Regions:
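Extended, low-charge hydrophobic alpha-helical regions
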Residues: 2-148
Length: 148
């Protein structure tokens, strides 16, 4: 009935507004579509260049792990993941915001902000913090095992 449709529409609108409010209260939004992950991975790789020995390899491996989301997005949109990552890095090196946008049956590299593909900053921050904690624990466990 019409009343049911209106009620459902009101609930959906309220849910959408709650999501927006939560995102803004928690520090806003960041570009989605893997754009922020590419930038984070690039920053990690830049830092890795100044680290010597095995630690550098561990830091680079962490950067590779951060690239998993854009790589998966590329695969899911039918793009070659290696070519997509190379192109994304080139765009970011040129100073543009670029992500993997699903357009119909294919994927394109474009500015996710222009396409309205945004992620809550708090969610991304929490994901990076959790991944960092997990990586640190793995390295510590590996050090303990290696010392025995």
């Amino acid at each position: 009935s019409t009343d049911h449709v209106v009620d459902e529409l009101e609930r959906s609108l309220k849910d959408a507004l709650d999501v927006v409010t939560a995102a803004l209260d928690a520090g806003g939004v960041v570009a989605g579509a893997g754009a922020i992950e590419i930038e984070i991975a690039d920053q990690i790789r830049d830092e890795a260049a100044g680290i010597e020995g095995r630690k550098q390899l561990a830091v680079e491996a962490f950067a590779d792990a951060v690239d998993v989301l854009p790589r998966t997005l590329a695969e899911n949109t039918g793009m070659d993941p290696i070519d997509a990552l190379v192109d994304l890095r080139a765009e970011h090196d040129a100073g543009t915001t670029a992500g993997l946008i699903s357009e119909g049956q294919t994927g394109i590299i474009a500015d996710p902000i222009e396409y309205g593909v945004l992620d809550p900053a708090a969610v991304k921050r929490e994901a990076v913090e959790s991944a960092t904690e997990a990586s640190t624990m793995i390295v510590r466990i590996d050090d303990v095992i290696a010392s025995n």
